[in-house]
């Protein structure tokens, strides 16, 4: 059993999602958004850090999964996103939680089946996979999708160690 905290970083809205993995079974524990209303960046970053620490304290995750930086058209936005990611990762590392990073296209491919999926498709699939009664908020759905992706890859890593697998010519058979 493992508890995974997924983070969709942002300098104004940071989504989070927490799920429990028991073998192949995933269960929803919580999700939401850390909203920063303060205009100056240092205080926004402090709010993100404090918010993530609060979530870590509440759920005690075993793993921290976060979206990788993508190249934005606006350099200023990309820098702010990188800083938000940095404080989020710092919160996890300071609590000795292992950090895993996943590209946005990889998350969409894993959860929806296509790396070009729309946000509404991600929300729908997260709702379906976790058996939720309603679609989660967009940023929270993205964070839950990141956590689901981590579970998928973590499960595959566990299977690679399975002695029943035969490795031949560079392929799993």
Curated annotation (Swiss-Prot):
Q: Where is the active site?
A: 8, 67, 139
The answer to whether UniProt assigns keyword Hydrolase to this entry is yes
Residues engaged in binding Mg(2+) 1:
8, 139
Q: What is the predominant subcellular site recorded for this chain?
A: cytoplasm
Q: Where in the cell is it found?
A: Cytoplasm
Which cofactors are required for activity?
Answer: Mg(2+)
CDD domains documented for this protein: RuvC
UniProt xrefs under Pfam families = RuvC
List all membrane-crossing ranges.
none
Give me the reactions it catalyses.
Answer: Endonucleolytic cleavage at a junction such as a reciprocal single-stranded crossover between two homologous DNA duplexes (Holliday junction)
Keywords annotated in UniProt: Cytoplasm, DNA damage, DNA recombination, DNA repair, DNA-binding, Endonuclease, Hydrolase, Magnesium, Metal-binding, Nuclease
A GO cellular component entry from the record:
Holliday junction resolvase complex
- The leader peptide range reads none
Query: What is any one GO biological process for this UniProt entry?
Result: DNA recombination
What InterPro entries has UniProt attached to this entry?
A: RNaseH-like_sf, RNaseH_sf, X-over_junc_endoDNase_Mg_BS, X-over_junc_endoDNase_RuvC
Residues that bind Mg(2+) 2: 67
Family of the protein in this entry? Belongs to the RuvC family.
Please give the function described in this protein's UniProt entry: The RuvA-RuvB-RuvC complex processes Holliday junction (HJ) DNA during genetic recombination and DNA repair. Endonuclease that resolves HJ intermediates. Cleaves cruciform DNA by making single-stranded nicks across the HJ at symmetrical positions within the homologous arms, yielding a 5'-phosphate and a 3'-hydroxyl group; requires a central core of homology in the junction. The consensus cleavage sequence is 5'-(A/T)TT(C/G)-3'. Cleavage occurs on the 3'-side of the TT dinucleotide at the point of strand exchange.
Describe, as the record does, how this protein assembles with itself and its partners: Homodimer which binds Holliday junction (HJ) DNA. The HJ becomes 2-fold symmetrical on binding to RuvC with unstacked arms; it has a different conformation from HJ DNA in complex with RuvA. In the full resolvosome a probable DNA-RuvA(4)-RuvB(12)-RuvC(2) complex forms which resolves the HJ.
Q: What is this protein called?
A: Crossover junction endodeoxyribonuclease RuvC
User: Can you name the source organism?
Assistant: Photorhabdus laumondii subsp. laumondii (strain DSM 15139 / CIP 105565 / TT01)
Chain's gene name: ruvC
